[in-house]
């Protein structure tokens, strides 16, 4: 079952009732991150005891520019940016971290060419974060002590790769 964007309480309640009756429901809601969806639903007036069992997973996504394949070249980044990238990547779940050599990071940029009209970028790529519901997140929702930060913290603890981490992983490819 597919519901267009959820913008109000009436649409949210219909979607939640469908999910609670066993239908797999896909929809969209505007937030800055996957963890922002839960506080957004609650701010609309959705009751926590209905929301918690209705959710299976939440996906956050953004489209970012892709470096042009024709004029790509390695970029030397500042020590500050490198330290920030390492700090973000160091927080990856262990399963993902084993694929990254933090001591050998290479970043790229496009210098601009005819193919990309001198921009250095051509096309877009999605960066994502996905968290699945677990008992801890459900308990936080039911306690009504919900913040985007608390949900994000629990999702990361449960193995979620954040959009920033996914973006850095894709930049390293």
Where are these regions (language model features)?
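Short, flexible helix-loop junctions that flank or precede catalytic/ligand sites
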Residues: 2-173
């Amino acid at each position: 079952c597919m519901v267009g964007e959820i913008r109000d309480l009436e649409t949210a309640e219909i979607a939640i009732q469908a999910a609670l009756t066993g239908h797999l429901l896909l929809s969209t809601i505007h937030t800055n991150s996957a963890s922002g969806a839960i506080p957004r639903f609650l701010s609309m007036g959705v009751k926590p005891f209905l929301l918690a069992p209705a959710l299976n997973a939440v996906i956050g996504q953004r489209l970012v520019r892709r470096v042009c394949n024709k004029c790509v070249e390695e970029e030397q980044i500042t020590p500050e940016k490198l330290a920030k990238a390492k700090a973000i990547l160091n927080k990856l779940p262990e399963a993902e971290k084993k694929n990254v050599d933090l001591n050998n990071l290479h970043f790229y940029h496009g210098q601009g060419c005819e193919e990309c009209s001198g921009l250095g970028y051509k096309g877009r790529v999605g960066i994502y974060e996905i968290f699945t519901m677990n008992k801890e997140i459900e308990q936080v929702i039911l306690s009504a002590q919900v913040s985007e930060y608390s949900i994000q913290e629990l999702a990361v603890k449960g193995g979620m790769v954040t959009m920033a981490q996914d973006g850095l992983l894709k930049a390293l490819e």
